[in-house]
């Protein structure tokens, strides 16, 4: 472990020099790759440096206690310092083990969040809107940028489908566990008998794809330009600004009309399409590799029921880790930390167990 850490420190120092090299700075692709690598190593190096300081404290304290000639007060102080340092050493060793776990290369990326109303008609579409608000409020609490990319709104204010770009530090690492089927149990607004209904919305979290990672060839792309429309389908723009893009080999389609100009809609559409197409091919590759890179939290199946939101009991249950919290109102308002932290800890624990086998 220590040889690996020393190697990491050496690479971190090398990266610092490379990132100040004008030749590297002028190469955008290489500069971004090296910057990500440096950011990935930063916590490892800082924790290891702290660990070495603690080892030094332990060594110094033991040496002084072994020399003798100390009064009782000094002995007691050194013993307390030694005990504290040994406890800290154990904590840091566990932190280092977790930091050295193989890291998902997408963890530092922004994400495209896609939510669809599934089983349950209008109620499922309304619940999709509730989930969108939950993720938006959580994003705001993290200091992330939240931007609607594509929305198919129903007549009662829900969403058949909605996509958002969430940008900021470690977005994917925290929200990657949200992919799957989310089930809601509540009395719908349209229910006159007061009966509890069960509906479902699906969530898909895709790491945003950089331009240098995925480029769709023009021959594989169909672009349609049309007039943006508002509620009820009426035309709201005399200039054709809305953009529809279709990736012909896969049939994946995106439509963009949120922006006022055709160019802005085109830019957002290609960003969303790149991510969806990249994700499509990545999923095929993952299936071929027998889900090797899928999270240990759940099966990784995107249709898997991962969580239930029970309104009558104010209860949220994450079925993958057996977590139940009587805090539904709080969680849907964006206070998701307790759920997300539990998923991260569970995932790390499982990976450590696999590593120690």
UniProtKB/Swiss-Prot annotation:
Entry's localization field: Cytoplasm
Record PROSITE patterns: RF_PROK_I
Family according to the record: Belongs to the prokaryotic/mitochondrial release factor family.
Any coiled-coil regions, as ranges: none
Signal peptide: none
Swiss-Prot/TrEMBL keywords: Cytoplasm, Methylation, Protein biosynthesis
SMART domains named in the record: PCRF
Pfam families, per the entry: PCRF (PF03462), RF-1 (PF00472)
Keyword Cytoplasm: yes
NCBIfam families for this protein: prfA, PRK00591.1
PTM entry text: Methylated by PrmC. Methylation increases the termination efficiency of RF1.
SUPFAM superfamilies for the chain: Release factor (SSF75620)
GO cellular component: a single term: cytoplasm
InterPro entries to which the protein is assigned, alphabetical: PCRF, Pep_chain_release_fac_I, Pep_chain_release_fac_I_sf, Prokaryotic/Mito_RF, RF-1
GN (gene name): prfA
Lineage, highest ranks first: Bacteria, Bacillati, Bacillota, Bacilli, Lactobacillales
PANTHER family named among the record's database cross-references: LD18447P
Record function comment: Peptide chain release factor 1 directs the termination of translation in response to the peptide chain termination codons UAG and UAA.
Gene Ontology MF terms in the entry: translation release factor activity, codon specific
Protein's recorded name: Peptide chain release factor 1
Modification sites for N5-methylglutamine: 234
């Amino acid at each position: 472990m220590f040889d690996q850490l020393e190697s990491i420190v050496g690479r971190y120092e090398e990266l610092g020099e490379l990132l100040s090299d004008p030749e590297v700075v002028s190469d955008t692709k290489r500069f971004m790759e090296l910057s990500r690598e440096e950011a990935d190593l930063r916590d490892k190096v800082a924790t290891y440096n702290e660990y070495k300081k603690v080892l030094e404290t332990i060594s110094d304290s033991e040496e002084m206690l072994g020399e003798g000639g100390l009064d009782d007060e000094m002995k007691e102080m050194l013993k307390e310092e030694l005990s504290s340092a040994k406890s800290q050493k154990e904590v840091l060793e566990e932190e280092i083990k977790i930091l050295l776990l193989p890291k998902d290369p997408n963890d530092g990326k922004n994400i495209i969040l896609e939510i669809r109303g599934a089983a349950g008609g209008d109620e499922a579409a309304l619940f999709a809107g509730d989930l969108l608000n939950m993720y938006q409020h959580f994003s705001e609490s993290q200091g992330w940028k939240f931007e609607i990319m594509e929305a198919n709104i129903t007549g009662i204010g829900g969403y058949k489908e909605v996509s958002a770009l969430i940008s900021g530090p470690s977005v994917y690492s925290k929200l990657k566990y949200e992919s799957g089927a989310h089930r809601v149990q509540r009395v719908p607004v349209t229910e006159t008998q007061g009966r509890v209904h069960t509906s479902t919305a699906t969530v898909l979290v895709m790491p945003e794809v950089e331009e240098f990672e995925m480029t769709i060839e023009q021959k594989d792309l169909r672009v349609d330009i049309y007039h943006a429309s508002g509620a009820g389908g009426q035309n709201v723009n005399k200039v054709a600004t809305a953009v529809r893009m279709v990736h012909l080999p896969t049939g994946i389609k995106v439509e963009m009309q949120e922006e006022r100009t055709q160019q802005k809609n085109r830019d957002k559409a290609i960003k969303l399409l790149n991510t969806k197409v990249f994700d499509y091919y990545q999923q095929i590759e993952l299936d071929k590799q027998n889900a090797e890179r899928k999270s240990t939290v759940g099966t990784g199946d995107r249709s898997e029921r991962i969580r239930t939101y029970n309104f009558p009991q104010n209860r949220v249950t994450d079925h993958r880790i057996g977590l139940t919290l009587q805090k539904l109102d709080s969680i849907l308002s964006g206070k998701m930390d307790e759920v997300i932290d539990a998923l991260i800890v569970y995932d790390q624990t499982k990976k450590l167990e696999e590593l120690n086998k």
